[in-house]
Amino acid sequence: MAIAVSHRFSPSGDLPVEAGRYRLVASGACPWCRRVLIARRLLGLTEAIPVSWSYGKGADGYWELTGPDGEPGVDPALGARSLAEVYEKTPGYTPPPTVPALVDTTTGQVVSDDSGDLLFDLSTAWWDLHREGAPDLYPLNRRNSTDAWDEWIGSQINVGHAVATHSKDPEKAAAAANGVLVGFDVIDTLLARATRMEASREDGLTMLDGPALSAIVAIGQYLCGDKPTGSDIRLFTTVQSYEYGGRQHYPGGEAPSISFWPALARWFRALEGRSGWVGPEERSALGCCRP
């Protein structure tokens, strides 16, 4: 994280829930941002938390903001051209600035840059502002399972993919890439078993490869039963990045398409086709072909 303290909306946190007070700086190309963007849409918080879009790095090498015309320029709400300018107002900031970044417009400071915290807090602390019929992304009766999935997906898949595609150390990149592919084997096997498909990637896997038992026993059509949860969001955005360009940068050449894992592919395509899971900004950034 780029800030020393990432504040929380939880009961033990210090941020008040207030529509219109915060602004999310995000990029559709970033899987960490897409976590928050998906939750924001699914929960009906698009008006309560407006977005300032970044489409890439500027002359300073950091995320640049956009003007009213959608071109690089001064963001009218934040009064800055570069995200670095916003972070520089924030106590405890250490470069480089990162996205997503939640800005408190009353102070102009970044109050959270942790996508996992934002996903969880929007799901559990912003209840009063959720749309009618919004999904419960972190149901209490599944919390042990979502916690277990979040921990395993975070290290095995999310961080693994980032290291595989960005590390300058060939050995670290190769080890991380192998971990992601084994992780896909595990998830494909568990989804196949739960949905009565043939577990085509089961050979060679051990219990040590998978998540905790509290995650395994919950799996159904989705990771924690018959409805998507925050854990599905965490996995989905990395699978997106993998499928739409990331796999081409894996060590040793292009890694297999997600279709190599039939049950995982079915899970992914089902979510990709659901309303709210892919917004126009993400679709443009990823080059997705599905409407």
Regions found by a protein language model. Give the residues of each.
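C-terminal alpha-helical interaction module
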Residues: M1-P291
